[in-house]
Amino acid sequence: MIRTTGIAGAGIFLLATMLSMRGKPTLSEISKDSSADYPAKIERLDPASNALIPEHAMWHPLANGFTWVEGPVWIHSGYLMFADIASNSIRKLDANGEVSIWLQPSGYRGQKPYGGTEPGTNGMTLDRTGRLTVAGHAARNIMRFESMDPHGTVTILADSYQGKKLNSPNDLVYDTDGSLYFTDPPYGLRTQSDQDPDKELKINGVYRIPNALQHKAGAPPDRDRLQLLISDMERPNGIAISPDRKWLYVSNSLPKKWMRYPLKKDGTVGPGTVFQDASGDTRVGSPDGMKLDTRGNLYATGPGGIWIISPEGKHLATILTEKATSNVAWGGKDGSTLYATTTDAVLSIHLNAKGIQP
C-alpha cells in the first residue's frame, strides 16, 4: 500500500485533517457500481500476451466511493473481501454486487485518535483450510480469523521481532508447507516514514513465520520463531511465491522495482536480483500487490495499472487502469477473473489465464 511516501510529517497530518474534515465515506455512499462495463486499454508489449488477455477484454466496475482500498481475496463460497483502509474496515462484496461491512474497526483500536490516514488493515489471504489471514497494517500484527465470524476467535501470529513492535505488516502469502511470508514497511504508521516516533525497528523487513498453519487457535505468537529474511529493502510491499516454489517475489515501492529471491528448501532465501525495473516509469502508481497465474506469470500492480511479467522477467503487457492500483486477486467460478483494488474502486476483468488462488 502506498499513498504518501516522501511527504514530510506535517504534510501527513495536514492530509489527515483534510480527510477528517470531509469525513469518511458512509456505507450509503459506498455501493455496487452500476456504471457500464467498458473496454480495457491494453499495452501489449509481447505477442505472448495475446494468450493471456482476450482481444476484447472488458473492465467490470463492481463498487466505488472509497478513499483507498486494498487486499482483495476471493472466498471460495463465492464472494470477495477487501480492506477499506481509510474507514478502518474490511468489506464484503457478495454475488449480487452488494457491499457490506464485515468488520469495523479492523485495524487500529487504540484509545487516542489514530492521527494518520490509514487506520485499517491491508493485505489478506487464506490458509489451505480456508482461514482468513490478515496483514494488520495499523494494528501492527498478523492476525488469523479462526472462522468467518468476524467476532469469533482471532489468533495473532506475529506482532514483534526481537522485542520490538513490527512496523505495519502490509501483504502476505502462504507457502505450500504452511509457512507464512509477509512484508513490513511503515505505511500503516501515522507519518508513514522511517522517522515515525512509533517506529521501533530500524529496518523495513520481509519475514517468515515457520509452519504458521499449525499455530494453535488463540495461542500467543511464537515470537522466538519469527525469521527475518530480507532487511535491505527500502519499502517492501507486495509478495508472492512462484508455482514451482523456486522463487519469492517482493515488490519494492521505493525505488520502483520488483525483486526475486531464490527460495531454499528450508524456507529461507538466497541473494535477490532485480526482476523488473520500473524506476523510470512516471505514470501514476508504484509496485504494490501482486499475484501469479498457473504458468508462473506475475500480475503486478505498478505504474499505469497491472503489469504482466513472464517467469523470465519479460514485461509482456500492462492492463491500464489509469489510476493508482493497490492489489489484485484471482477468483470467480473458473479462477480466471482478476479483481483489482484502486484509489476509489473495485474492478474485475476476465482473462484467458487461470490464477493461483490461496
What residue ranges belong to the model's regions?
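Position-driven detector of the extreme protein N-terminus
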Residues: I2, L19-R22
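Sequence-structural signature of mature extracellular/luminal beta-sheet repeat domains
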Residues: M21-P358
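N-terminal compositionally biased, intrinsically disordered segments and leader/signal-like regions
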Residues: T5-G6, M18, L27
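Bacterial N-terminal signal peptides that target proteins for export
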Residues: M1-A10
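Bacterial N-terminal signal peptides
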Residues: G9-T17
